[in-house]
Every structure is written in structure tokens, then in C-alpha cells.
Amino acid sequence: MGMSSERLERIDNMLKQSLVDNTIPGAVALIARNGKIVFHEAYGNADANGKKLKRDAIFRIASQSKAITSTAVMMLWEEGKFRLDDPISQYIPEFKNPKVLVNFKYADTTYTTRPANKEITIRHLLTHTSGIGYGAIDKDERMKMIYDKAGTIDLFTTAPVTIKDVVLKIAQLPLHHNPGEQYTYSLGLDVLGYFVEVISGMTFQDYLLKHLFIPLGMNDTNFYFSASKSDRLVAIQHKVNDRWENYPNTFYDVNYPIEGAKTFFSGGAGLSSTAKDYATFLQMFLNGGELNGKRFLSRTTIASMMGNQTGDLYGGGDQYYGLAFGVLTEQGQAKGGLGSQGTFIWGGYFNTQYFADPKENLIGIILKQTQGSTGDQTSWKFKQMVEASIDD
């Protein structure tokens, strides 16, 4: 497969050493080259009680959901259902006449706005340039407070709420900035999950199952799981006095994928998956939109998705943002250890990372479930060492 077995062993040793160093409680790592899995191992524990992690463990992939949502949007785009530069208000009228935040009073959370200078488009939502906020995890304290007061549920919930409920609330809230002028990580992909429902006439979950997960054979990827799979869900852990403990409920319920109402199909952060399933999704992209004889996207569409959509608004020259992923530039490749130019990259809130290198037909995925500071170095080491294991 063009990978050095000795160098793959170094990766194995690095991950084992990370357990010894106590910087991770456990991980599943997968490497694929030329469409074949060459490395797929589980390390450490799935919870703080010593349950062993297995290769088919299910992880909350959080923001790794975004690329899947973008893919669904582009599949509908290929059907001629809309244009990328259509205003979202054409399909969700509540987004008409967006407003930008001007002044905010911390004392009583009142604020003033001004009209935005343009409408939010579907492209803005795909590229995190809409100006929409990110609620509980927004970097701007004012936005956190505005979203909290409005009662938006941003992510990871067991409550009986739908994405429509939340998206219609988001539509009434102020933007960080005029659409298209800055990159601000946002709930835009949650808006697009509801957009998929509007365009397709199906629930977002049903659309993904019918058009992506079932045809791709991604049988362990979903928003919610039944009791038969619940024991495969990895616990979120954090360090307390240098010991790993199961993470408590905070602004979200840690068991959201297996408990509660199971009605919130969050396109931005709601999915859980396995390393093998996510590798399957990425391989479809490396194959130019096809897998196992089934066509999901045209290679011409993928070329647009991998193109620079954000200019210099994102990535500081090493990366730009396309329509679904961060994409490595020539400058990023020159830095070393990140992959070839065109490598696409993202990760998730609970310490999951992936990259796919089209030039080398190479995929690397490393999944953990942690919160807080742990001293974890596996993300950069894994990427650097995987690329260095190419041997052809």
C-alpha cells in the first residue's frame, strides 16, 4: 500500500506512550492509503471505569458533522434546487433583513443593531462568513448572552426540540458582522440542516440516512442510537488531579446520543460515528465523489468545494476554507507535517481530528473523547508521522 510497516509501528508506539504519559485516556486511530485501511487500532479505555476501547467504538464527532451537512447541501445543489448565492431568506423567510449587533449593555443584555448591508446567502452559511453566532461556545461574550437569553439550544441536547425551532430563533438574532466580510465559526451548518429539510421535504436525519449513510455503508453514523449500540458510545473524560474521570453534565447532557427526545438533528455538531465510517466518507471525496460504484457528487462539484471560498479571511496563509473543509495551501505544505497542498482537514469539540490528502490518496483519523487541558500531543504527532510513513 506504499506505507512503511516500520514507520506505522512508530505511530503505534507513540500512541501507546501517550497512554503511559497519561495525556489521553484512549483513542482509536485509522490510516487508509489508496482506498485500503493499512492501520486501525484501539488504545486505552472507553470510560473511567476501565472498559477497554474497541475499534468499532462510537465517538461524538461534533464539528466533523459539518462536512457531512455540506455534502448533503451540495448533493441537492447538483439537482438544480438552488444557487449558492441565493439568499437563505428565499427558502427560510425569517432570515429576511438581517441586522448586525452595534451596542450591548451587560447590565440588562439589551442591545442595538443596524441593518446588514446584504442578505445571508447559502454560500455564506457553508463558509462561516454569514455573521451568525455560535451560542454557548461563541468567542464573543455578548453573543453568548444574547443567544442564552433567546433560549437557543446550540448543540448536544436531550431536550424535545427540533432544528426548525432553533433555526427560527437564530433568524431573529443579530449578526457579528455584515455577511461575507469576516470568517466567524457559527451555527450556519445547523441552519443548513434545516434548509435540507425545507428543500427535500424529509427530516435531516432521514435525508442523510437515505442519500449518504446507507448507500455508503456508514451503518454506525447517526444523530441518535438505539439501546443495541449504546454500550459502544465512548464516555467523555477529563483529568481531575491527574486521574481520568467521566465528564459530568454541564451546559449539555453527555449522553445526548443515546438518551432523551432524540429530535435535534444538528448539522453543525450532532452526529456520532466510528473511525471506519468516517474514513468511508472521506474516501468518497478522495475518489472524486464515488464509492463502491455509487456516485454521490461529481468531481467538478468537489473541485468547487475544495476551492478557496474565503480569500484570506481564514487560515493565515497555511489554509483556506472551502465549502466543507479547511484546505492546505502550498505555504501550508511547505511548513511540513501537515500534508500535501490540497489536503482537507477538520476536527471536533471532543478532541477528534482527521485529514485526507488527495495527492497521496491518504486518510488519517484519530478519535478521542476528552474535555479540558490534558497535555495531549497526539493530534499533531499523528498527522506528522502518518505523512512520514509514506514509502513509495
Protein language model regions, located:
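A generic structural motif
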Residues: G44-N45, F251, T370
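Short, surface-exposed beta-strand/loop micro-motifs that present aromatic residues
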Residues: T343, F350-I363
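Short, conserved catalytic-motif segment at the N-terminal edge
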Residues: G2-I61, K81, V100-K105, Y256, ...
